[in-house]
């Protein structure tokens, strides 16, 4: 029974998982979230109040 011999399919299985575990974290870590906290420090908040002519 060839399915009981682990040599051919086990190495393919291990290599496939090694490739997936190497590629997927890179894809996840390269994803940029739009609402990071470090973006708040780049813009200086305005210090003047708004002018509302109707109030």
UniProtKB/Swiss-Prot annotation:
Q: Which domain of life is it from?
A: Eukaryota
- Membrane topology field: Single-pass membrane protein
Q: Which GO terms describe its biological process?
A: proton motive force-driven ATP synthesis
Instruction: Decide whether keyword Transport is in the record.
Output: yes
The record's principal subcellular location, in a coarse class, is mitochondrion
Q: Per UniProt, which keywords does this protein have?
A: ATP synthesis, CF(0), Hydrogen ion transport, Ion transport, Membrane, Mitochondrion, Transmembrane, Transmembrane helix, Transport
State which residue ranges cross the membrane: 4-24
Q: What is this protein called?
A: ATP synthase F(0) complex subunit 8
Organism in which the protein naturally occurs: Dicentrarchus labrax
Q: What lineage is this protein's organism placed in?
A: Eukaryota, Metazoa, Chordata, Craniata, Vertebrata
Gene it is expressed from: mt-atp8
């Amino acid at each position: 029974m060839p399915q009981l011999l682990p040599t051919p399919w086990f190495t393919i299985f291990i290599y496939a998982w090694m490739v997936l575990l190497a590629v997927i974290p890179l894809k996840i870590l390269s994803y940029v979230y739009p609402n990071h906290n470090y973006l708040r420090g780049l813009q200086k908040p305005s210090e003047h109040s708004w002018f509302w002519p109707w109030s």
